[in-house]
Curated annotation (Swiss-Prot):
Cleaves the N-terminal amino acid of tripeptides. Belongs to the peptidase M20B family. PANTHER family: PEPTIDASE T. CDD domains: M20_peptT. This is Peptidase T. SUPFAM superfamilies: Bacterial exopeptidase dimerisation domain, Zn-dependent exopeptidases. Binds 2 Zn(2+) ions per subunit. Its EC number is 3.4.11.4. The active site is at D80, E173. The gene is pepT. GO terms for cellular component: cytosol. The keyword Cytoplasm applies. It comes from Edwardsiella ictaluri (strain 93-146). GO terms for molecular function: metallopeptidase activity; tripeptide aminopeptidase activity; zinc ion binding. The lineage of its organism: Bacteria, Pseudomonadati, Pseudomonadota, Gammaproteobacteria, Enterobacterales. It is found in: Cytoplasm.
Length: 412
């Protein structure tokens, strides 16, 4: 298992799907199994200070190979896969020298089509790794783990000058808890990069402000034949709440810097209903306004209800936009930008329409922009990645390490 592809295929064989609503971290045992495997691999590769925390966070050090002082930098990826689709029994397909057109995913009716995913037109001649149409792939973010691990091996075995490098592999990023038990002081890096982005060239230093909104609705059920003035239909109230939200401000109709309200689930009966939303916005003002709007709608719909019937709203902030924190350290993004340009990769700087561990870590003293992995269509059965994109991610990691050492020598 010495090359990039072998590593990636090994990592996706672990079922590490995280589970929302679980207090313990990691939320699933499968993540611990991968963490222990990564710990063993790091030790076998000869990295130092290899640790595995009680919460499943793996850390290790690649010592410097230069004599002059160099800032310690870090690279971080997460082990879990999204709850949105199964990560069990992942069966990757390797499509060499992609010639265009539809790709059959397994033996069913699922296909990966350039009609639905036009980015495929840009990937002719490349090696694609896809799903078999039954699960997600796990490129988010096991490709990041494979890329970091491969970069460390090549740096250790090669002649590229570099300072001390810390690596970390975290649990439960997909359920917003990846950085909750991350020991920034123990990690000991001056800055870091998550390797958790998408297509080649992506360089991200701003992300959504995010919150989850849970709405509990208690109604009153009686026989529908004698319900007038007595029945309170909890599902009807839920429908009214959703109808009062802006219909166009949903994920499927927004992009760029536009925020949204997303109804993730709704279940219930006449007697009781529950709704779960996520709320996203790039500006803090817009974020707070969205949360207030949801509270106001719930209050409006709940007016005049019988005292035994009510609407209860619970708001929980998940993470905030790291833009202002990263902006305090412009050299970090400049370094990544330069690394890409040196490798003839055009940096694509755009906001993350999501979050990363780096978003939370940036607020805990570890500024942490996000680098591409080379993957696409995360969180579903159409997820895929290119081997060429993964190799470019490895090269960027190595070039950042080299540039950091070079600039430190000049400054010294």
């Amino acid at each position: 298992m010495n090359n990039l592809l072998d590593r990636f295929l090994n990592y996706v064989s672990f079922d590490t799907q995280s589970k929302p609503g679980v207090r313990q971290v990691p939320s699933t045992e499968g993540q611990f199994r991968l963490a222990r495997a990564l710990q063993s691999e790091l030790l076998a590769l000869g990295l130092e200070q290899v640790t595995l925390s009680e919460h499943g966070c793996v850390m290790a050090t690649l010592p410097a190979n230069v004599a002059w002082p160099v800032p310690t930098i870090g690279f971080i990826a997460h082990m879990d896969t999204a709850p949105d689709a199964s990560g069990k029994n992942v069966n990757p397909q390797i499509v060499e020298n992609y010639r265009g057109g539809d790709i059959a995913l397994g033996i069913g009716d699922e296909i990966l089509s350039p009609v639905m995913f036009p980015v495929l037109h840009q990937l002719l001649g490349q090696t694609l790794i896809t799903t078999d149409g039954k699960t997600l792939l796990g490129a988010d973010d096991k490709s990041g783990i494979a890329e970091i691990m491969t970069a460390m091996v090549r740096l250790k075995q090669g002649n590229t000058p570099h300072g001390e490098i810390r690596v970390a592999f975290t649990p439960d990023e997909e359920v917003g808890k990846g950085a909750q038990h991350f020991d920034v002081a123990a990690f000991g890096a001056e800055w870091a990069y998550t390797v958790d982005g998408g297509g080649v060239g992506e360089l991200e230093c701003e992300n959504f402000n995010a919150a989850s909104v849970n709405i509990k609705i208690i109604g009153n059920n009686v026989h529908p034949g004698s319900a007038k003035g007595v029945m309170v239909n909890a599902l009807g109230l839920a429908n009214r709440i959703h109808a009062l939200l802006p219909a166009a401000e949903v994920p499927e109709q927004t992009d760029g810097y536009e925020g949204f309200y997303h109804l993730v689930s709704m279940k219930g009966s006449v007697e009781k209903a529950e709704m779960h939303y996520i709320v996203r916005d790039f500006s803090r003002e817009g974020f707070e306004a969205r949360k207030k709007h949801m509270m106001a709608i719930a209050k409006q719909v709940g007016q005049g209800l019988h005292p035994d019937c009510y609407i209860e709203v619970t708001l929980d902030d998940s993470y905030y936009n790291m833009r202002d924190e990263v902006a305090k350290h412009p050299h970090i993004v400049a370094l990544a930008r330069q690394a890409m340009c040196d490798l003839a990769i055009e940096p694509i700087e755009r906001p993350i329409r999501g979050g990363t561990d780096g978003a939370q870590l940036s607020f805990h003293g570890l500024p942490c922009p996000n680098l591409f992995t080379g993957g696409y269509n995360f969180h579903g059965k159409h997820e895929f990645i290119t081997l060429e994109g993964m190799e470019k991610a490895v090269s960027v990691i190595m070039r950042i390490a080299e540039l950091t050492a070079g600039r430190a020598r000049v400054a010294g």
